[in-house]
Amino acid sequence: MWHEARKHERKLRGMMVDYKKRAERRREYYEKIKKDPAQFLQVHGRACKVHLDSAVALAAESPVNMMPWQGDTNNMIDRFDVRAHLDHIPDYTPPLLTTISPEQESDERKCNYERYRGLVQNDFAGISEEQCLYQIYIDELYGGLQRPSEDEKKKLAEKKASIGYTYEDSTVAEVEKVAEKPEEEESPAEEESNSDEDEVIPDIDVEVDVDELNQEQVADLNKQATTYGMADGDFVRMLRKDKEEAEAIKHAKALEEEKAMYSGRRSRRQRREFREKRLRGRKISPPSYARRDSPTYDPYKRSPSESSSESRSRSRSPSPGREEKITFITSFGGSDEEAAAAAAAAAASGAAPGKPPAPPQPGGPAPGRNASARRRSSSSSASRTSSSRSSSRSSSRSRRGYYRSGRHARSRSRSWSRSRSRSRRYSRSRSRGRRHSDGGSRDGHRYSRSPARRSGYAPRRRSRSRSRSGDRYKRGARGPRHHSSSHSRSSWSLSPSRSRSLTRSGSRSQSRSRSRSQSHSQSQSHSPSPPREKLTRPAASPAVGEKLKKTEPAAGKETGAAKPKLTPQERLKLRMQKALNRQFKADKKAAQEKMIQQEHERQEREDELRAMARKIRMKERERREKEREEWERQYSRQSRSPSPRYSREYSSSRRRSRSRSRSPHYRH
């Protein structure tokens, strides 16, 4: 089977190759014999019989139907011929004053060039009219002489050169010269012999080459052309234009032939080479995406005024005096490890651990927490609003949570106005910090009981207390109108991760909540806006104030060690994630609206179908009632007059009524 398929494939391939070769030969043949169509135009006049029937032909040629034209008996025409009315052709006398516009004059000169250029060339070459007519007669009889084209001459020359080529010595040029010299020596002899033959038949088809003419010959040509209605200089100018047009046509034809040669399935490489050859001399500018590199986020230089005003808040690189040391977090949760990491970070940043911090200034950060202030103020400068400050605090707290407990940073870095589960997690961290900072708080008192008692609480009560404590923060920031919504939102569900983290017992969760509350109280006590602090925090007792002052240095060290600077790529990633979340919510909302709309349309369609079915049933019922009434009328009429005449009709109507009564519509 495989051999048969191979044989068939080989046969097909051979047929295709033969067809291609045949088409190539046919194309070459037609290219050879192709000429100007005007050269094939020949007009011949002969006497012939129009009618095949001899009787009809004799009747048509009888003197009754034929008449001499212009009195010439040798030239007989039909009397219905239109030439019978051309007995007298009046001579044309042009008007003396001719007003011709410049456009008409230029058109007339062009027409004269097309009419008489052959005669002008014959006059210039000294060829008489008899010689020209004889040459035309010879061409009509035998056709034009086939002269080898320039391409064929080049091919023959290449073949001759390749025969004389040797690899031992480079004598190719000499061989070519030797091969060309006999040709040049032979050519004058050939020309002499040809000239002897062409004395009788001069070659008048050779067009005058304008580029080879000198000034005298050009002037002579133009002078010869003026006798044929052309202006001085028109003939040579139009000859040049014709030559340029012929060159352009030849070039376009060569291009098309090259393209046709490269057509086919296997000629992709040849087409590419042809395209590269065409575009080799052209200069191509690089595309826009290759012209510039991707942006680099190196620290850029700033003006002295900007750097002096924002050096504390915007500087990313550490000063040469205090270079930061990179500390790697290797363990989570232990208080000893946290204290050691905080001490290492404080030593690296150059802060004295035993030195108490100065009171916070509203204009700038405290000196005891330079590292944390430097990192925090990169995301929120002193000129930004309080809302952006709170968002940067939440992002810093989420990163602290990532380093402490190994949670995913993105799930905590969202603002609590984004989604409900994230708002519950965020309010939980807020409420924990608030419970440890506010001694007189009711929720904090309830939450700070023993671990066993706390784990025994119902989930609803726990979520309610948590939502209330988070709601107090919301009330301080936004107003009292969010209490019911956050209470209802947070009381109906608890995420598994949240319930797991709440039921987890031991010193790890307590120390984590303690460190969170300390960092939260420290960040709120160092907030640069005093009115926000008044809104969000009630008045605390002096003991709580002392506790806060004691915990401030440790919290500053922790934030300085555990809060990294966000790179622009990470910032862009966060922004893209937020945009994706927004788009997801919008798509979800649009899908819900679409589903509601489809449901509404379905209900409307069902109602319409129900109404249509009801109408159809009513019409059917009315039709049945009409038929029944008609039948009863007919039956009563027949029962009144039971004559034998109507007995057949009566029986047929009875039969019809019986069949109708059997149908389900007429059952009583």
Swiss-Prot record:
The keyword Coiled coil applies. Residues 182-214 have a biased composition (Acidic residues). It is found in: Nucleus. PANTHER family: CLK4-ASSOCIATING SERINE_ARGININE RICH PROTEIN, SPLICING FACTOR SUPPRESSOR OF WHITE APRICOT. Phosphorylated in vitro by CLK4. Residues 173-232, 252-668 are annotated as: Disordered. Keywords: Coiled coil, mRNA processing, mRNA splicing, Nucleus, Phosphoprotein. Probably interacts with CLK4. The gene is Clasrp. One of its GO terms (biological process) is mRNA processing. Its main location: nucleus. Residues 340-353, 378-395, 487-510, 518-527, 636-645 have a biased composition (Low complexity). Residues 354-365 have a biased composition (Pro residues). InterPro entries: SWAP, SWAP_N_domain. Belongs to the splicing factor SR family. Residues 265-283, 396-435, 475-486, 653-668 have a biased composition (Basic residues). GO terms for cellular component: nucleoplasm. The keyword tRNA processing does not apply. Residues 290-313, 436-446, 584-611, 619-635 have a biased composition (Basic and acidic residues). Probably functions as an alternative splicing regulator. May regulate the mRNA splicing of genes such as CLK1. May act by regulating members of the CLK kinase family. The modification Phosphothreonine is found at residues 327, 567. This is CLK4-associating serine/arginine rich protein. The modification Phosphoserine is found at residues 101, 285, 294, 331, 335, 541.
